[in-house]
Swiss-Prot record:
UniProt organism field: Pseudomonas aeruginosa (strain ATCC 15692 / DSM 22644 / CIP 104116 / JCM 14847 / LMG 12228 / 1C / PRS 101 / PAO1)
Signal peptide: none
Family: Belongs to the RmuC family.
One Pfam family named in its UniProt record: RmuC
Name used for this protein in its record: DNA recombination protein RmuC homolog
Gene: rmuC
Length: 453
């Protein structure tokens, strides 16, 4: 029994110990809450003190505002009294000026109608003079352009007509040239018999070549040059017989140094065997000359913009035709080496084409120059039109400024003319008077009314 009671007592003691521990923790929490509440109470006390100070300042501000409000109310009552006095004075002035305003309004309407009529007449006259002046100046600007365009059209028409005549005359010229070549062939054959030396043959070939160039219409020093000295890449010297210039900074080389000794022997031979041998030598000499001329490669020379081929000129038509009859492939073989064999007939036709190219180039240059001048003239015309618009705007601004200045002189109460005339009426010494029509427009008021204003 005692043991059970001890056990029970022990259990009760353990429970009390647990409650004691719980109470201790609760007490500790209460202590913490008390400390926190004490801090909050202190903060509330400080806040209450601040609110008291703020309430005191608010009371002071309220007193000041009440004082200011009383002053403002007194000021407002004074202003209301002044406003009533000013309103009464304003009504009196409005009543006194209303009649004058009615009279002035009717006079102003009449003056405005007169001024509008006068301004319309002035604007119509100015517009008419301005239109006449503009038309005259526009004609002065357009007449040169019209004349230049007409001249250009005339030159183009003449160029087309000239080209048509030249095409027609070219066929006639070729027919005449064929007949001439027949005679030249006979004369050249006889002349060949007389030309024995290689140097003499070369000089004679150059002479015939230059005569053909002149006959084609080409001018020395302009469309062609003779004996031009050129330098190769390795410093070697070349001197072609003739350089024919083409449009676009191109040149054509013409060589006239072909040997005709074998052909002279062919003409002079009486035996068929000797003639065949001489003809064979003539073809061989011509081939050798083509090969040597091709090896010079004029295209690589400094300062020369040659075409891909060189013209080999044979001054005797019969020598050319005889070689082709004996060797039909001669022309094609030479062409494969960039050499074109030409006679006086074929060269003249080629030169005619070159001369036509030069004429076309000069016409194109003239057309470009005319187009540039026409464009420049058109640009100046555009600038003139812009200046014309600006002049019109300035005239409109000038009219507005003139109307504004005129209004300052004659319109409104106390305008300049009215005030100036009132000074004169008050006794200002003046030797001159304003025009009557200006005084009528300004409606000069009597001195008494001016004083009232």
């Amino acid at each position: 029994m005692l043991g059970e009671r001890l056990a029970t007592a022990q259990l009760a003691q353990d429970g009390l110990n647990a409650q004691l521990e719980t109470s201790r923790e609760a007490y500790q929490q209460l202590g913490e809450r008390h400390a926190r509440f004490a801090g909050e109470v202190a903060a509330l006390r400080r806040e209450a003190e601040l609110m008291g100070e703020e309430r005191q300042r608010a009371s002071q501000a309220e007193a000041r505002w009440a004082s200011e409000r009383q002053g403002r109310e007194e000021e407002l009552r004074r202003l209301a009294s002044e406003r009533a006095a000013l309103a009464a004075e304003l009504r009196e002035q409005q009543e006194s000026h209303q009649q004058r305003l009615t009279d002035l309004q009717s006079a102003r309407d009449e003056l405005r109608a007169q001024f509008a009529e006068l301004a319309g007449k002035i604007f119509d006259e100015r517009e008419q003079r301005f239109a006449e002046t503009s038309q005259q100046r526009l004609g002065q600007m357009l007449d040169p352009l019209k004349e230049r365009i007409q001249a250009f059209e005339k030159r183009v028409e003449e160029s087309y007509q000239q080209e048509a005549r030249e095409r027609f005359s070219l066929s006639k010229e070729l027919e005449r040239l064929q007949q001439l070549n027949l005679r030249l062939g006979e004369e050249a054959t006889n002349l060949t018999r007389a030309l024995k030396g290689q140097k003499t043959q070369g000089n004679w070939g150059e002479l015939v070549l230059e005569r053909v160039l002149e006959h084609a219409g080409l001018e020395k020093g302009r469309e062609y040059e003779t004996q031009v000295s050129l330098k190769g890449a390795e410093g070697e010297r070349f001197q072609p017989d003739v350089l024919i210039r083409l449009p676009g900074d191109k040149q054509v080389v013409v060589d006239a140094k072909v040997s005709l000794t074998a052909y002279q022997q062919y003409i002079a031979a009486d035996d068929d065997l000797l003639r065949q041998q001489a003809l064979k030598q003539h073809v061989t000499s011509l081939r050798n000359h083509v090969k040597g001329l091709s090896g010079k490669d004029y295209r690589r020379l400094e300062g020369l913009h040659s075409l891909d081929f060189v013209l080999l000129f044979m001054p005797i038509e019969a020598a050319f035709s005889t070689a082709l009859q004996a060797e039909p492939n001669l022309f094609q073989d030479a062409f494969a080496q960039n050499i074109v064999i030409v006679s006086p007939t074929t060269l003249l036709a080629t030169l005619r084409v070159i001369d036509s190219l030069w004429r076309q180039e000069r016409q194109n240059q003239n057309a470009r120059e005319i187009a540039e001048r026409a464009g420049s003239l058109y640009d100046k015309f555009v600038l003139f039109v812009q200046d014309l618009d600006e002049v019109g705007s300035r005239l409109q601004q000038l009219d507005k400024a003139y109307a504004a200045a005129r209004n300052k002189l004659t319109e409104g109460r106390g305008n300049l003319i009215s005030r100036s005339e009132q000074l004169k009426l008050l006794g200002a010494r003046a030797s001159k008077s304003l025009p009557t029509d200006w005084l009528d427009r300004a409606l000069v008021a009597p001195v008494e009314e001016a004083g009232e204003e």
